[in-house]
Design a protein with these regions (language model features):
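Nuclease catalytic cores that cleave nucleic-acid phosphodiester bonds
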Residues: 3-8, 12-173
Length: 173
């Protein structure tokens, strides 16, 4: 089975997604990034994806770092490197017969470039919809689980006999 990898243009997503857009436009990039990463984490866990979210250094000059947050690999590019450049290079490296690489961006030039390299393209709106559907599915599943009354399973006959023996021994004490 192929390893599924989703490369995300982080600031592109935060600028387009309904929930993160207001934070992005007010310059509250930390809040926008946190919301995006939390949503991507839930989506990735449910879908069995590895997510690498790339942010341009233009908004955080001199940072260049890679770290894990919410089970998502977060990359801040070099100061002179765009997220597009980094994603194109990484998509080319990762696109092997063992990997299925998808790139989430609404930048049409970027979509065509990575598509030409064999990666799948996912526009921002489509990824936002996929994440929303996953959240809805998770909510339905969690609503079906009743932690107050776990489902009862009938005891098999051997376990029932063992329990009766233990109770008889206790009564003898």
């Amino acid at each position: 089975m192929k390893r599924k990898i989703l490369l995300v243009d982080g600031y592109n997503m935060t600028a387009f997604w309904r929930e993160t857009r207001p934070f992005f436009h007010r310059g509250e990039l930390d809040a926008a990034r946190t919301i995006l990463l939390q949503k991507l984490s839930n989506y990735a866990s449910f879908e069995g994806l590895e997510v690498i979210c790339v942010f341009d250094a233009q908004y955080m000059p001199g940072v260049r770092q890679t770290y894990e947050e919410f089970n998502v690999t977060v990359v801040f590019t070099e100061e002179e490197e765009t997220a597009d450049d980094y994603i194109e290079r990484l998509a080319a490296e990762l696109n092997t017969p063992k990997n299925q690489v998808s790139v989430a961006t609404s930048d049409l030039n970027e979509q065509w470039t990575v598509f030409a390299q064999g990666a799948l393209r996912v526009p921002a709106r489509e990824l936002e919809k996929r994440v929303a559907v996953t959240k809805s599915d998770l909510n339905k599943l969690s609503g079906q689980i009743n932690l107050q009354r776990p489902p009862l399973r009938p005891m098999d006959s051997q376990s029932l006999r063992d329990l009766q023996k233990m109770m008889e021994k206790k009564d003898d004490l």
